[in-house]
């Protein structure tokens, strides 16, 4: 169990990620795949039901014993909260309202964020774009572990600890690898989330808030739901960059297990990814796949070939960008233009200048 990992570096590759070329081939061979693009009409209702259910659980557990709260957080709330993080993942691809309504998708992501107790929705979207566009590229894809993680978590006990601490590495790694300016939407996301947490604390007490927060943390660490963090891109086979999981846990994770399919077509909603696989099976059947979340986690811990270094990595194609997109400001500015505020401002300036000129003449 104390055996150290056999890798001492990432798996550096000069090849481009395979997803774009496979996407082009599939679209050319099966043009009907485009019918799967777009909105998941059920997503709004499923997400809203889970948010309301978690608020109900907060009411139900406000006077419960701490042991019951911990058990409920692991077996119930944790599964739901992790599902909400993956709903946010789906929403980040605008599958709730479509690409024509990005602001609606961002606000709906904040709604899905509420039971998680930590503001992640907008920040996740900001970094997830790079994960798809620059998969595995050094300094751009923050899904790849830092050198410290890879150098320190090298034995089975340490890898187990790394899995337990995954929510903290996942949350703070972007601040180390790729610093970006906070955007207006991120600040709004934080304000809304903190306000919700304070309301839970005020009306239901500390036990209910703990139920939400502990459920989020534990479900992203030593929990079957967290198996997808490892299954998606860790190199169980060195010449394959992305892996899919086909098992029952997809029912609790918005089909995030269909990860090869997702990277091939990010704008197909999670619920329709099995249709993509059925439509073009020859592109996916020969790839290594996973069928058990517990097996994924166990093999990662005990197999010396696996560890944080077991990731394909590339040299970056572009430089980092510090400044973010101030999306809300753009919409506010557009709204002010629409209702004529700027025309009124221009008129007032002209009147003011006219008055000043008249006074000078007098």
Curated annotation (Swiss-Prot):
Signal peptide: none annotated. A motif (Histidine box-2) lies at residues 128-132. The keyword Chaperone does not apply. A motif (Histidine box-3) lies at residues 259-263. CDD domains: Delta4-sphingolipid-FADS-like. GO terms for molecular function: sphingolipid C4-monooxygenase activity; sphingolipid delta-4 desaturase activity. Pfam families: FA_desaturase (PF00487), Lipid_DES (PF08557). Its EC number is 1.14.18.5, 1.14.19.17. It comes from the Eukaryota. The chain crosses the membrane at residues 45-61, 71-91, 107-127, 160-177, 198-218. Pathway: Lipid metabolism; sphingolipid metabolism. Keywords: Lipid metabolism, Membrane, Oxidoreductase, Sphingolipid metabolism, Transmembrane, Transmembrane helix. GO terms for biological process: ceramide biosynthetic process. Disulfide bonds: none annotated. It is found in: Membrane. The keyword Acyltransferase does not apply. One of its GO terms (cellular component) is membrane. It catalyses: an N-acyl-15-methylhexadecasphinganine + 2 Fe(II)-[cytochrome b5] + O2 + 2 H(+) = an N-acyl-4-hydroxy-15-methylhexadecasphinganine + 2 Fe(III)-[cytochrome b5] + H2O; an N-acyl-15-methylhexadecasphinganine + 2 Fe(II)-[cytochrome b5] + O2 + 2 H(+) = an N-acyl-15-methylhexadecasphing-4-enine + 2 Fe(III)-[cytochrome b5] + 2 H2O; a dihydroceramide + 2 Fe(II)-[cytochrome b5] + O2 + 2 H(+) = a phytoceramide + 2 Fe(III)-[cytochrome b5] + H2O; an N-acylsphinganine + 2 Fe(II)-[cytochrome b5] + O2 + 2 H(+) = an N-acylsphing-4-enine + 2 Fe(III)-[cytochrome b5] + 2 H2O. Belongs to the fatty acid desaturase type 1 family. DEGS subfamily. Bifunctional enzyme which acts both as a sphingolipid delta(4)-desaturase and a sphingolipid C4-monooxygenase. C.elegans contain specific sphingoid bases, which are unique or different in structure compared to the sphingoid bases found in other animals. Two examples of these distinctive compounds are: 15-methylhexadecasphinganine and 15-methylhexadecasphing-4-enine and this enzyme can catalyze their conversion. This is Putative sphingolipid delta(4)-desaturase/C4-monooxygenase. The gene is ttm-5.
């Amino acid at each position: 169990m104390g055996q150290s990992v056999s890798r001492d570096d990432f798996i550096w590759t000069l090849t481009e990620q395979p997803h774009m070329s496979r996407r082009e081939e599939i679209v050319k061979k099966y043009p009907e795949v485009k019918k799967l693009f777009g909105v998941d009409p059920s997503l709004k209702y499923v997400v809203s039901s889970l948010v309301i259910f978690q608020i109900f659980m907060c009411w139900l557990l406000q006077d419960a014993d701490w042991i019951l709260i911990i058990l409920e957080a692991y077996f119930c709330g944790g599964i739901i909260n992790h599902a909400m993080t993956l709903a946010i993942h789906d929403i980040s691809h605008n599958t709730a309202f479509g690409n024509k309504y990005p602001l609606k998708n961002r606000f709906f992501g904040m709604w899905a964020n509420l039971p998680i107790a930590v503001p992640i929705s907008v920040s996740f979207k900001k970094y997830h774009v790079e994960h798809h566009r620059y998969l595995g590229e050094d300094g751009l894809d923050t899904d790849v572990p830092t050198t410290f993680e890879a150098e320190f978590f090298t034995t089975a006990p340490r890898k187990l600890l790394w899995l337990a601490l995954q929510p903290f590495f996942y949350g703070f790694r972007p601040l180390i690898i790729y610093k970006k300016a906070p955007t207006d939407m991120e600040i709004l996301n934080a304000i809304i989330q903190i306000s919700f947490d304070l309301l839970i604390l005020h009306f239901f007490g500390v036990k209910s808030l703990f139920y939400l927060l502990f459920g989020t943390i534990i479900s992203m660490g030593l929990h079957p739901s967290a198996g997808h963090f490892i299954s998606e891109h860790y190199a169980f086979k060195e010449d394959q960059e992305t892996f899919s999981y086909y098992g029952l846990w997809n029912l609790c994770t918005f089909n995030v297990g269909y990860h090869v399919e997702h990277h091939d077509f990010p704008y197909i909603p999670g619920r329709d990814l099995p249709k993509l696989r059925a439509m073009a099976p020859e592109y996916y059947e020969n790839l290594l796949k996973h069928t058990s979340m517990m097996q994924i986690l166990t093999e990662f811990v005990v197999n010396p070939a696996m560890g944080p270094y077991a990731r394909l990595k590339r040299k970056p194609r572009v430089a980092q960008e510090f400044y973010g997109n101030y999306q809300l400001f753009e919409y506010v500015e557009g709204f002010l233009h629409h209702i004529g505020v700027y025309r009124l401002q221009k008129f007032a300036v002209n009147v003011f200048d006219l008055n000043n000129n008249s006074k000078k003449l007098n």
